[in-house]
Amino acid sequence: MSSAQSRGGKTGGKVGGKVGAKRHKKTQKEHINGITKPAIRRLARRGGVKRISFPIYEETRNVLRTFLTNVIRDSVAYTEHAGRRTVTAMDVVYALKRQGRTLYGFNS
C-alpha cells in the first residue's frame, strides 16, 4: 500500500515532478491590457489633459507598445553586442539616446 492510499488520497498521479503531454496549447496573453484606464488617465492628468475620449485608451496602449518594442529591441542589440545576457540600465539609456530621447541622470 502506498503512502497516498494510506492517507486516503487519490492514486495514479505522476510522482517526482514529471509532467505528461499537455492537452491544450498555452495562449499568449495581451499584457498591454495591464495598462489600465486609470493609469492612462493619471498620465494624461500629469500632461495637463482634462477630459479623455474613450478611443484614446486603446490608441495609447498601441503607441506605448510600439515605443517599448523599439526601445527594447535597441537595448537588446546593445546587450548582445557587449556579449552579455543581462540588459543594464545603460543599455536602455543608450537605446533612448539613439532614438533622440536623451535621458539624464544615469551616467556610469
UniProtKB/Swiss-Prot annotation:
Coiled coil: none annotated. SMART domains: H4. It is found in: Nucleus; Chromosome. Its main location: nucleus. One of its GO terms (molecular function) is protein heterodimerization activity. Keywords: Chromosome, DNA-binding, Nucleosome core, Nucleus. Gene3D superfamilies: Histone, subunit A (1.10.20.10). One of its GO terms (cellular component) is nucleus. Residues 9-19 have a biased composition (Gly residues). Residues 1-36 are annotated as: Disordered. It comes from the Eukaryota. The keyword Iron-sulfur does not apply. One of its GO terms (biological process) is chromatin remodeling. Belongs to the histone H4 family. The nucleosome is a histone octamer containing two molecules each of H2A, H2B, H3 and H4 assembled in one H3-H4 heterotetramer and two H2A-H2B heterodimers. The octamer wraps approximately 147 bp of DNA. Core component of nucleosome. Nucleosomes wrap and compact DNA into chromatin, limiting DNA accessibility to the cellular machineries which require DNA as a template. Histones thereby play a central role in transcription regulation, DNA repair, DNA replication and chromosomal stability. DNA accessibility is regulated via a complex set of post-translational modifications of histones, also called histone code, and nucleosome remodeling. This is Histone H4.
